[in-house]
Amino acid sequence: MAALQEKKTCGQRMEEFQRYCWNPDTGQMLGRTLSRWVWISLYYVAFYVVMTGLFALCLYVLMQTVDPYTPDYQDQLRSPGVTLRPDVYGEKGLEIVYNVSDNRTWADLTQTLHAFLAGYSPAAQEDSINCTSEQYFFQESFRAPNHTKFSCKFTADMLQNCSGLADPNFGFEEGKPCFIIKMNRIVKFLPSNGSAPRVDCAFLDQPRELGQPLQVKYYPPNGTFSLHYFPYYGKKAQPHYSNPLVAAKLLNIPRNAEVAIVCKVMAEHVTFNNPHDPYEGKVEFKLKIEK
């Protein structure tokens, strides 16, 4: 039977550990001599330098295949989303309630519109160009300053009676409010095969007390988004791009009754029946005007 090994004392263990850390007989530190530590350190330095260089080279080659003028992330929706101004969200979506006799109930709404349209002032649009072609504005090269592409102007005065210039209250005071409709941007999206997309607003459910459909006055006329604002080439290619707008002035909203309204963008390549996204191609909101 093998003899049992003698159990080492604490002092012996400490002595062995000290000799492992530094052995004066062999000149080893942590099991290696100084020269071996130098060589192994140089090996790992060279190894990680080479690995870092290879990684940087692969990353550089990959970045050369990426177009800097194409967004890194894009939505999978086929059609752009549609937004509304002023945008007041309640528990069940967009809900706008105000009293024509109390300006405190609609002052914030008009201020929201003024703040939004500040980006469409002549000063804010001075870097864009005037476009009148009413056709798609294709740009294959970067002919604008700083290696960019031109953007077409859209100024607030194009919204005429809903611009906030002639009527700073946007019709809220008289119970005929203006709402501004905007399509979200999709790079290189073409809304139709040649006809300008237009906005069409209607009651979701016809109010019983109103025997006629929703009456709307659109600005610009016919409620169209001119084709020369398309296609959009991205934020880097068109840093001064502004979304075109359509204003809808609602003329026959009944008093003291909540009505549901939907505004759709009518175009060949715009869909508005996506059950998973209620804002694709259209915007729905509830409106109640009290007196």
Swiss-Prot record:
Superkingdom as given in the UniProt entry: Eukaryota
Membrane topology (Extracellular): 58-291
Gene Ontology CC annotation, any one: plasma membrane
Location of the protein in the cell: Apical cell membrane; Cell membrane
Record membrane topology: Single-pass type II membrane protein
Gene3D superfamilies: 1.20.5.170, Na, k-atpase alpha subunit (2.60.40.1660)
UniProt-listed GO biological process terms: cell adhesion; intracellular potassium ion homeostasis; intracellular sodium ion homeostasis; pH reduction; potassium ion import across plasma membrane; potassium ion transmembrane transport; response to lipopolysaccharide; sodium ion export across plasma membrane
GO molecular function: ATPase activator activity; heterocyclic compound binding; P-type potassium:proton transporter activity
Region immunoglobulin-like, annotated ranges: 194-291
Primary residence: membrane
Domain characteristics, as noted in the entry: The C-terminal lobe folds into an immunoglobulin-like domain and mediates cell adhesion properties.
Family the entry assigns: Belongs to the X(+)/potassium ATPases subunit beta family.
Protein name: Potassium-transporting ATPase subunit beta
Species: Homo sapiens (Human)
Gene responsible for this protein: ATP4B
